[in-house]
Structures are given as C-alpha cells and as structure tokens.
C-alpha cells in the first residue's frame, strides 16, 4: 500500500543521515521509503547516491536505472547513472549516459562537468592501455606478427578490451564475435583463457576450492566459538554457578 507521508518522513531521515555521512543508515531509510512509495523517482536517485557513497556501484547503477525508467526526462537520474558507471570504470558508458542527460538539459552544469571529467579520464586510460598493449605485443612474437599484418591491431584490441570492461558479464559473447586474432590478444592481455571446455573445468575446480575453503573457515569459526563458550563456563564464579543451579531448580 502506498503511504506517501511515511515515505516522505523516511526520505527526510535518509537525507539527514546522508548529510552526516551515515550512508548505511541512509540506504536503509531510502529503501524503506521506496517500500512505501515505489514510484517516487527521487527516492531511487537518493538511494543510488547513498550506494555510490559506499562504493556499491552495481547497486547504485541499478537504482539509477530504476529512477530513469520512472522519469526519463529528469536530468539528475542521468547524473546518478553516469556516476555509478564511472565508479565501475565503465567510462565509455558513463560518457554516453551524460550525453543522454544533456539532450534533455543542454545547459546542465553538473552534467557538463561530469562529461568533461569522464572524457579526460577516458583519454588518459586509453593512452595507458595502448602503451601497455604495445608492450605486450612487442614481447609476443605471435601478436607482433598480427600488428605487422594490421597496423590498427592494437586499437582494435583496445576497443574489445574496453567493451569487456563495460560489459564484463557478456565477455564470452563479445569474444565469440571477435576475430580469433583479437580473442588471442585479449586473453594474453588478461593473462588467461576465457573459452573452451578445459577452462570451464578449471573454473569449476576453482569454485570448488573456494567453496571448500569457505566450509573449512566456517567450521574453524564454529570450533573457536565452542571453545570460547567452554572457557567462559569454566571461568564462571561460584556465585554464578549457584545462580544457574537455583534457576534450574525453579524451572524444575
């Protein structure tokens, strides 16, 4: 049931916490406010900002997308989305988002400044990546031969790597559409293969090892907890023990 008054009350509490730097509490208040008014775009914007302040950029992006889906003509939604993408280092995506916002409000100073900043970072990152890629290529005879065949090879490789960084969940799809020479360069850039049954088996083994480590860690924590409880029992005073015995008699 929609309760706008309660949503407004919770929103104000969330804003107060946000201003005080209590971002976890702000997330809770904004989330509770959304429960009371799930179609208020401002609440999703505020929630996105709180998540971003905590470095939880995937959640910030999700909230920003929801904000935009409710109110597409609100510039601040695009600021929130671009900020989340920036935090995820999806610089090309952030640039596109800020440009979308500027179509709605061409004179928005916040969008203009954010776009300028992300473009500068994108250029710097591209230069650093190209330098790193050229170093890899020069030290790999096979990749070096690809560059000799195609002088644009490093830039094609760069574009694919940036696509993967922007859409890491789609890495297999991206690589499946690439020329094999690009896929090979990408795998050498990241230092491991992404395709093939052998790699799937390696990934499963890695997951199994991690699961086993988590299980052992949990067992160790439980063992230590039991030991601490036993030590506490052994260190109890006579008065505490008599008190427990008295409680048992009363219960019986």
UniProtKB/Swiss-Prot annotation:
InterPro entries: TPR-like_helical_dom_sf, TPR_rpt
Keywords, alphabetical: Chaperone, Coiled coil, Cytoplasm, Repeat, TPR repeat
Main subcellular localisation: cytoplasm
Biased composition (Basic and acidic residues): 201-233, 243-252
Function statement: Acts as a co-chaperone and mediates the association of the chaperones HSP70 and HSP90 probably facilitating substrate transfer from HSP70 to HSP90. Stimulates HSP70 ATPase activity and, in contrast, inhibits HSP90 ATPase activity.
Recorded coiled-coil stretches: 197-239
Recorded GO CC terms: cytoplasm
GO MF assignments: Hsp90 protein binding
Protein name per Swiss-Prot or TrEMBL: Hsp70-Hsp90 organising protein
Assembly and binders: Monomer. Homodimer. Forms a complex composed of HOP and chaperones HSP70 and HSP90; the interaction is stronger in the absence of ATP. Interacts (via TPR 1, 2, 3, 7, 8 and 9 repeats) with HSP70 (via C-terminus); the interaction is direct and is stronger in the absence of ATP. Interacts (via TPR 4, 5 and 6 repeats) with HSP90 (via C-terminus); the interaction is direct.
Protein's cellular compartments: Cytoplasm
A Pfam family recorded for this sequence: TPR_8
TPR repeat residue numbers: 7-40, 41-74, 75-108
UniProt xrefs under Gene3D superfamilies: Tetratricopeptide repeat domain
Domain notes from UniProt: The TPR repeats form 3 domains; the TPR 1 domain is composed of TPR 1, 2 and 3 repeats, the TPR2A domain of TPR 4, 5 and 6 repeats and TPR2B domain of TPR 7, 8 and 9 repeats.
